[in-house]
Amino acid sequence: MPRFSCYEVRSEFPELERGIVYLDNAASTLKPRRVVEAMREFSYRSYANVHRGVHRLSMEASKAYEDAHEVVARLVGGSWDEVVFTRNTTEAMQLAALTLAYNGLLRGGEVLVTAADHHSTLLPWVRAARLGGGRARILPLDGRGVPRWDLLEDYITEDTRAVAVGHVSNVTGVVAPVEDIVKAAKKVGALVVLDSAQGVPHLPVDFRRMGVDMAAFSGHKMLGPTGIGVLWARRDLLEELEPPLGGGGTVSRVRLQGGSVEIEWEEPPWKFEAGTPPIIEAVGLAEAANMLMEIGMEHVARHEDELTSHTMKLLEPLYSEGLIRYVGPDKPGERHGIVSITTHLKSPDELGLLLDRRGIAVRTGLHCAHILHDHVDASMGSVWASFYIYNCKEDAERLAEALEEILTTRR
């Protein structure tokens, strides 16, 4: 497959015509024309509720919705019936945590999380562990804000029921050693749940080959629309477990027998998709996934690594002079796609506003990772630049030039 060009794909993104350097991709990516057009065409010509009727429109909509499961499965590995559509990564992680707690799989044990995790990973599993009568155990961080993966064997014990961690940190860009995590967890029979919100959009993944049991990610972080996320889970787990949420679409039959309600659940994934699902959004997500597969996730990952390295090289003078500090590793090869900095000269929000005046969009704040920022003495937050397929080297150069101007100009 020929290598893709960031310059060629930029025409798919009208917002870039405004001259904006968009470096807030870890929060949400821009939407290509083809995704918007696919959703518009479906909305105008084939929309109806799914799995609710035998009329033509419902059948067409149901097929498009089912096909979207197939497309997503091709992107992440596994089969279509291992793909559960949710509202976003946060809801997917809540669903995973509640499902395990509801079915007693966390009872009296521990769930291992890390102090670097996004709140959408940390909070659901802390609460689920409590619901199960157990506790969450926290893997500590090193001085850079990176989990102490070298302590995995000490923190995963016979009491560990699940390990729930971020695939790629949304602050440091550090990629978790999934193979090591799975190996340690399987020794004690613990389940591995991956928050891949920053993984699936940026790296080649095959969850089945990776050996994880569940994984979550969002459409809006990978060229798709808001309002749709994915919980991927092993088919045998989905078959075995009872869903914590019930309602329309989750059951094949409900009967009243002797004063009690008997429930026959649908097959996976439907028994975990309660209520009317995100139908139009599923069409958009499928189109986004197709676009990424056409480009090739290996190319996406390599492109982002090159931009990360180029950016940190350009920022080296500011770093060596002590004008900026990295949150996370200060070596490009140890972080992927995200460069987070702080400076004693400006607050994160002030720096973000000054960059915005120069046409550069970055993210400022605590990035839903308060504990990590507290740990690295950045309680006011940080400023991140995060890259995607439509960012080119010129974007990194504009960022570096703007930061130099802002941080070295005396007022």
From Swiss-Prot:
<keyword id="KW-0663">Pyridoxal phosphate</keyword>
<dbReference type="GO" id="GO:0031071">
    <property type="term" value="F:cysteine desulfurase activity"/>
</dbReference>
<dbReference type="Pfam" id="PF00266">
    <property type="entry name" value="Aminotran_5"/>
</dbReference>
<dbReference type="InterPro" id="IPR000192">
    <property type="entry name" value="Aminotrans_V_dom"/>
</dbReference>
<dbReference type="InterPro" id="IPR010970">
    <property type="entry name" value="Cys_dSase_SufS"/>
</dbReference>
<dbReference type="InterPro" id="IPR020578">
    <property type="entry name" value="Aminotrans_V_PyrdxlP_BS"/>
</dbReference>
<comment type="similarity">
    <text>Belongs to the class-V pyridoxal-phosphate-dependent aminotransferase family. Csd subfamily.</text>
</comment>
<dbReference type="GO" id="GO:0030170">
    <property type="term" value="F:pyridoxal phosphate binding"/>
</dbReference>
<feature type="modified residue" description="N6-(pyridoxal phosphate)lysine">
    <location>
        <position position="221"/>
    </location>
</feature>
<keyword id="KW-0808">Transferase</keyword>
<dbReference type="InterPro" id="IPR015424">
    <property type="entry name" value="PyrdxlP-dep_Trfase"/>
</dbReference>
<protein>
    <recommendedName>
        <fullName>Probable cysteine desulfurase</fullName>
        <ecNumber>2.8.1.7</ecNumber>
    </recommendedName>
</protein>
<dbReference type="InterPro" id="IPR015421">
    <property type="entry name" value="PyrdxlP-dep_Trfase_major"/>
</dbReference>
<dbReference type="InterPro" id="IPR015422">
    <property type="entry name" value="PyrdxlP-dep_Trfase_small"/>
</dbReference>
<dbReference type="GO" id="GO:0006534">
    <property type="term" value="P:cysteine metabolic process"/>
</dbReference>
